[in-house]
Every structure is written in C-alpha cells, then in structure tokens.
Amino acid sequence: MVTSSPFKTIKSDEIFAAAQKLMPGGVSSPVRAFKSVGGQPIVFDRVKDAYAWDVDGNRYIDYVGTWGPAICGHAHPEVIEALKVAMEKGTSFGAPCALENVLAEMVIDAVPSIEMVRFVNSGTEACMAVLRLMRAYTGRDKIIKFEGCYHGHADMFLVKAGSGVATLGLPDSPGVPKSTTANTLTAPYNDLEAVKALFAENPGEIAGVILEPIVGNSGFIVPDAGFLEGLREITLEHDALLVFDEVMTGFRIAYGGVQEKFGVTPDLTTLGKIIGGGLPVGAYGGKREIMQLVAPAGPMYQAGTLSGNPLAMTAGIKTLELLRQPGTYEYLDQITKRLSDGLLAIAQETGHAACGGQVSGMFGFFFTEGPVHNYEDAKKSDLQKFSRFHRGMLEQGIYLAPSQFEAGFTSLAHTEEDIDATLAAARTVMSAL
C-alpha cells in the first residue's frame, strides 16, 4: 500500500462537483473526467519526482507524467531553478528570443528529419500547421491518417481519432462539417496494403501520410516489422510526404525519437510535450526546402502570440540537457521493461487474458489475448475489467491513465522500489478482479 492513510477523496469530490458548474464536464480536457473508468476524477495538489499528491493527502506513483512531458520526473530542481531565472526577465516577449535559437539547434541536432523548425504552443497546433504545409508543398488536398491515431482536436483530424474520442465512445465530433474531413482518408494501422489501395484509388491527389509511428492514443501499439519502412517506400513512389507525429514519442523513445530508434526518416515531424519540459509547447520541422514555405520565409501562413516564449524554451532546453546525459534511455528501458513484463506475468498468474509491451519509457497493456496490431484489435480489450483494475490501482496508490486507450509513461525519477510497489499493487488488484 503506497498511500499513507485510508483512501478517501472527499476534497477531490467537492472540488470536482464545483468544477462541473464552471467548466464543461468539470475539466479542461475530456479524459481527465474519468468517464471511461467510472467514479470521480482525482484532483491533484502537487507533484514531485515520480509522485503525485491529491487534495485529500493521498500519494500516488504516477505513470501518466502529465501525459508524457515529465520524463525527468515532476518539478525537476534544475528545470525549476532555470525557470526562476527566466521569469525574472519576463514571461513572454512577443518578439524574437535568443533561447529559441538554442532549443532549435538542439532539436535539429537530435531529430534526423528536421533541418528547420517552427515553435508553436501545442501538439494540436503543430499538427494543424503541418497539415497545411503538406498541402502547400505538394499542391494536393488529400491526406491519409490511420484509425486510432490522434493528431489533436483540429477538425480535419477528428476522423477515427482514438484517444479521447474513443474514451467517450464517439465515432467523431459533432460540429465538424463533412466537407472538412472529405479529404481525410483513413487506413488501419499496420496495413500497408490498405495504404497502397488508397493511393491507387486517388492517383496524384494525396499530399501525404501522417501517423503516430508508435501509437499511444489507442493504447500502446507498436509498428509491425517493415511497416514504417513500407510507408517510406510508398510515399516516395507517389511523390507524397511522410509525416511522423512524434508529439508523444519525440525524445521519449530515443533522444531522436522513433525515427532514430527505427531508422526511418520522414519528411516532416511534429513535436510537443517533452520539448517544453512541462510547459505548453509544440513544434514542427523537416526538410529545409519544405520549411522555407512557412511565413515569413514563404507564403504558407502560421503564427502565434506565445510561440517560442522564454519560459517554455527554458524548460525545454534544460530538459533536453538532462536527457543527453549517458545512460538515460538505457535506464528508462530497463525499468519500463520490468514493469511491463511484470504486469503481463501477474495477469497470466491470476487468470486474466492480457497483452502489451514497451519501448523505452512508454508502455501499455490490454485485457485481451491479443496481439493488438491496430485500433480494431485494441477495442477488443475488456473495458469493464480495465475500469475495475484502474480503480483498484488508484486505491493502492498507483496512478494510471484513466482510459484503456492511452499509453503509460515512466520517468528517470521512478525507482526500482517504485516498480516493486507497483507490481505488488497489481498482484493485489488482479487477484481480486
């Protein structure tokens, strides 16, 4: 038991009840409302290292990590100190900032596909801009995305989008005109033949293919052997662009992202989460000849009041400096593999069908025999069982993403003792399911 006192959520319940009168659903982002796992959401008071404390005093080992950015652990002292210094100079300039150059150089040095980069304020914003750029560069309107891959909440991407849409049980979102998504083609993840068929059916009309190279928004799904390489070949054959949405995987799977880990280089990449060190940030980048189309260098317009603000740049720079230290990704892989393998072994020992895995500091599992290759496979998971498991783990002091359709994250702050405690809690909970 990780919590130091009997599990109670009185204050969380009170705050959430009040929030429901002030904000739609009581939250600022849908998955936080615990809709898919039942019960009331936990209201956090503070976070530090690998832990979170709620307003009732319960402590949790946190495997959400503010949905990925907290790869060095929450409130890392070096990041906090750097932010204190930066804040003394102002929170936003609305003008060029030397820190943008520093972070831009770090991103360009790290990510194989990026020769130039533009900073924005969120992953959604990065994906919106990169879609416009795909079309501007190719002169074509249609794109291919994959079922269950999430690229933010922009209208044109809310087609079989996984993540929060899947959590709420909605096929897509009201308010999105059919004309907006008419040029968004979809294929099952890991299905090269479906992609080839779409290109054959739409000759000379497809600007490119965008995907999460490792899916984290239908649960955790890895690419089959040859899938990413196949997409690269197909897009080159048709003079179309390949775009990796590495908002979640960038600087997490490896310092250079999935493209470094798997050796497949796209034309464009979107980033977010980790590159802001916990502050709002996004970025997109790629080949110089493509990026030169972005205003003011070129005609494709995109702008943002807070883009490249000094606080996000500062936190991002310090976070990437920490990640460059030797042994970082080896440690993440080691502890995450032990966690993932342990969860699957416990499920088997306690009689529950389960499958899953991990790559570096990202993991996930499903309550189904599997294997899970795509979104349709992911939907076979026993969602009611996951809900009971999630609640049980919460009461044991383990904070997991409140949706079967989200990946989990470890951090450099997680210890072997944290993994031990998590597996002990999982054994207790799965034995009682």
UniProtKB/Swiss-Prot annotation:
The modification N6-(pyridoxal phosphate)lysine is found at K273. The keyword Thylakoid does not apply. Transmembrane segments: none annotated. Pathway: Porphyrin-containing compound metabolism; protoporphyrin-IX biosynthesis; 5-aminolevulinate from L-glutamyl-tRNA(Glu): step 2/2; Porphyrin-containing compound metabolism; chlorophyll biosynthesis. Its main location: cytoplasm. Pfam families: Aminotran_3. GO terms for molecular function: glutamate-1-semialdehyde 2,1-aminomutase activity; pyridoxal phosphate binding; transaminase activity. Its cofactor is pyridoxal 5'-phosphate. It is found in: Cytoplasm. Disulfide bonds: none annotated. It catalyses: (S)-4-amino-5-oxopentanoate = 5-aminolevulinate. GO terms for cellular component: cytoplasm. Its EC number is 5.4.3.8. One of its GO terms (biological process) is chlorophyll biosynthetic process. Keywords: Chlorophyll biosynthesis, Cytoplasm, Isomerase, Porphyrin biosynthesis, Pyridoxal phosphate. InterPro entries: 4pyrrol_synth_GluAld_NH2Trfase (IPR004639), Aminotrans_3 (IPR005814), Aminotrans_3_PPA_site (IPR049704), PyrdxlP-dep_Trfase (IPR015424), PyrdxlP-dep_Trfase_major (IPR015421), PyrdxlP-dep_Trfase_small (IPR015422). NCBIfam families: hemL, PRK00062.1. Belongs to the class-III pyridoxal-phosphate-dependent aminotransferase family. HemL subfamily. Homodimer. This is Glutamate-1-semialdehyde 2,1-aminomutase.
